[in-house]
Amino acid sequence: MPKKTLLAVNCVSSRVAFLSSLALTCAAAFAQAPSATTTVAELPPHPWVVPSPREAQGYFTNLKEGGVYESPFVARFGLSMRGLVPAGQTAGRAGHHHLLINQPLPLDFKKPLPFNDQYIHFGKGQMQALVDLPPGPYVLRLLLADQGHIPYFVYSKPLNITISKQNKGVTPASVLGAPEIQVLSPASGEVLTVPFRVQFHASGYNVSNASPKVPNTGHFRLTMERAGTKSEVLNFTGGETETWLKPPLGDYKLQLEFISNTDGSVTSKAKPVAIGVKGR
């Protein structure tokens, strides 16, 4: 009998038990470290929607590495290849955002994230946070977690920023502004090659996968209008906050709406964005 087989027999009662034990060990080891494998996208069913060239990840849409800011300020969250759903709700691989302040990623991705000032939970499906920190350097991270606050391997790069001044007596409403939705990119007037990314944002609204029908939540709907053809309607019922598109060449008007997950009404409408799509 080969030496390796003898060692296996000495460690377990049978070859089957050995292989089962080995599989469990490998699975546990894999679960402890973030995966570098590209996640299969959960895409809305439309022929113009294409998979993201990026892996599933969180990111800040309005903050820059090395940026200097006065507080309070608004941090806006972006998410690739996943959707949002409030805490306590299950919808595929959707989750909710967490903002980590001066904290590394957890060592154990199988334990719930703590609740404190350095692990801030956005369990309603929010896409932004009002951040009010004293002057100094900070490292910010985004981390997506499931219904029980157990993190996915979906997170942002660490973002190093400096707070230069903390303004006192500032009301949250004056910083946050009125509730609205926006197309963050592309900008109106841009001419793009395919595929291109369209980023959505909701201020003052909670985003969710439509399936759980959570009250006070909604999802994005994008209508693409082109002269001489019927409008194309893309429903992001999975709670997605961005998409990659490959439409036919031409000029388009993008109209983004926020749709209630309980009654299907239009809760908010963004300013239209006019773009051109050309060949490479």
Enumerate the predicted regions with their spans:
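Boundary at the C-terminal end of the N-terminal hydrophobic targeting segment
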Residues: 29-36
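A residue-level signal for beta-strand positions that form part of recognition/binding surfaces
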Residues: 21, 57, 96, 180, ...
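Intrinsic disorder/low-complexity segments enriched in polar/small residues
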Residues: 4-5, 33, 129
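Long, low-complexity serine/threonine/glycine- and acidic-rich segments characteristic of extracellular
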Residues: 45-51, 74-80, 88-167, 188-189, ...
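Short, compositionally biased P/S/T/A/G/V-rich stretches that sit at domain boundaries
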Residues: 36-70, 164-193
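Bacterial N-terminal signal peptides
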Residues: 14-27
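N-terminal secretory signal peptides that target proteins for export/translocation
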Residues: 1-13
